[in-house]
Amino acid sequence: MKTKTNVIGLHHFEEAVAMRNSRVVYDRKNSSFYTLKRGMVKWNQVLADAAVFHCSGITCAISRDAMESTMDAIKLAVADGLTIACDINYRKNLWGYGLEPHDVLFQMMQYSDIIFGDQNEWEVASGVPHIPFEALDENYEIDKEAYLAYFRKMHHLFPKCKKMVMAVRNQIASSHHTLSGLLYDAVEDQLYTTRIYDIEPIVDPMGVGDAFVAAYIHAHQKWGDKNQYCLDFSLSASAIKNTIPGDQNLVSEEEIINNMTSSGGRIQR
């Protein structure tokens, strides 16, 4: 969207090295989303012929008007019968207009059919403590019964939600992470899990969550309710993103699928 300010929102990323943590500084003031006002977007036109409306907690964090515009769009999309996909995307440093993140995110999630987030984001948005993920390698065993009970509790809070998707990460060192994924299908009352990726070295962790969500939406649209396949595809895309510099996951569907079934490292000729 072009506005009179013509400012592009930026973020500045300081990489983690050894004992030094990574740090993100946001520069979103006067960007198009920051200056968004209710009524500026003609949602009826935007949503025409759409099947899925995807919303993000980042947009809701930028300003009250951006949040209210997002909520307007969600309510209209629900009325039109669209699938609502919500990425919690909690970014503490973006919130500053007076409302509590929990209250806003909780409301957004109540309208959603599919909810994405990592373990910490689910805790902030729901108020329910997360289950620790402490994998040091790919042999770690996830407590499936504990997660099943956890997601049943989440479904009580968000009864409209049909699929709850969580990426879990353990940062062992700045360049060594373990990564896994979970999907709870509320209709089936069934939990799906993935393999654990033991990733070392990490090239760039930025955009890993976005890669996970984008891959899931793609998979869900293409393969429907093949829950295990969609989850495996999503985590594979997310894992690959850790090896790619920059914020974009420059990878093809074929590469993601190949990574699902291989250990990597081979020369592709």
Outline where the language-model segments fall.
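Short, solvent-exposed loop/turn segments at secondary-structure boundaries
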Residues: 63-68, 95-100, 245
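Conserved post-catalytic alpha-helical subdomain immediately downstream of the catalytic base
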Residues: 174, 187-263, 267
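Hydrophobic beta-strand scaffold residues
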Residues: 84-85, 116
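Active-site beta-loop-alpha junctions enriched in small/polar residues
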Residues: 29, 58, 89-93, 120, ...
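A short helix->loop->beta-strand "cap" motif at the edges of active sites that frequently abuts
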Residues: 76-83, 158-162
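Conserved N-terminal subdomain of the carbohydrate kinase-like
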Residues: 1-58, 256-269
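Catalytic-core regions built around general acid/base machinery
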Residues: 68-81, 103-111
